[in-house]
Amino acid sequence: MHFLIPAAGSGSRMKAGKNKLLIDLEGESLIYWTLKSVFSASSTNWVGIIGQPKDKNLLLNSAKDFAHKVHWINGGDTRQQSVFNGLKALPKDAEKVLIHDGARCLINPELIDLCAKQLDENEAVILATKVTDTIKIVDNEGFIKETPDRNHLWAAQTPQGFLVDRLIKAHKMAIDKNWTVTDDASLFEILNWKVKIVEGAYSNIKITSPIDLKIAKLFVKDP
């Protein structure tokens, strides 16, 4: 399985003053823990990190202790552009790809393998968890408009997996039509292409705040 890791997080909400994937977590960088999980998945055979040139040496240094090679891909101005750069850098024989946020450093390798397996039967899959909170939809003035049935609500995670040719086609259409999305599955939604939900884990959090980092430390100490 080919694996792409967008890794251009600024760390502004972490007040880190650097790429948040370089923040220390129990003696190693966040990207180290992400790579450890990725390489622990039996389905992984090719990994590319997509990031900004200024972070290249530090990010790749976090990968030096792994037996597998990590390929570097220069990112774009947005996550969407960065992923498209990553897709263009895949080997020509790549048929399937998993895309995973570098800041989700607690991903279980078994979930990675599960997503890879689901791509045998689906052209697009994403990890997600059932929403347990009551969600409110509000108007522009902050007043509640409605409460959707949470039985139909899932919180999207990564990895998200796709057939490479289909995802490249979706990205090219997004460029032509000037679509902007926050994840790749959204492109498939716009095109009315099916995306299969694979139930993930609540521990697969995205590190975006100091609170998240404290939670991650607990999981790393006691997995």
Curated annotation (Swiss-Prot):
PROSITE patterns: ISPD (PS01295). Pathway: Isoprenoid biosynthesis; isopentenyl diphosphate biosynthesis via DXP pathway; isopentenyl diphosphate from 1-deoxy-D-xylulose 5-phosphate: step 2/6. The record marks 13, 20 as: Transition state stabilizer. The keyword Electron transport does not apply. GO terms for molecular function: 2-C-methyl-D-erythritol 4-phosphate cytidylyltransferase activity. One of its GO terms (biological process) is isopentenyl diphosphate biosynthetic process, methylerythritol 4-phosphate pathway. Gene3D superfamilies: Spore Coat Polysaccharide Biosynthesis Protein SpsA, Chain A. It comes from the Bacteria. The keyword Repeat does not apply. The record marks 150, 206 as: Positions MEP for the nucleophilic attack. InterPro entries: IspD (IPR001228), IspD/TarI (IPR034683), IspD/TarI_cytidylyltransf_bact (IPR050088), ISPD_synthase_CS (IPR018294), Nucleotide-diphossugar_trans (IPR029044). Its EC number is 2.7.7.60. It catalyses: 2-C-methyl-D-erythritol 4-phosphate + CTP + H(+) = 4-CDP-2-C-methyl-D-erythritol + diphosphate. Keywords: Isoprene biosynthesis, Nucleotidyltransferase, Transferase. Belongs to the IspD/TarI cytidylyltransferase family. IspD subfamily. Catalyzes the formation of 4-diphosphocytidyl-2-C-methyl-D-erythritol from CTP and 2-C-methyl-D-erythritol 4-phosphate (MEP). This is 2-C-methyl-D-erythritol 4-phosphate cytidylyltransferase. It comes from Prochlorococcus marinus (strain MIT 9215).
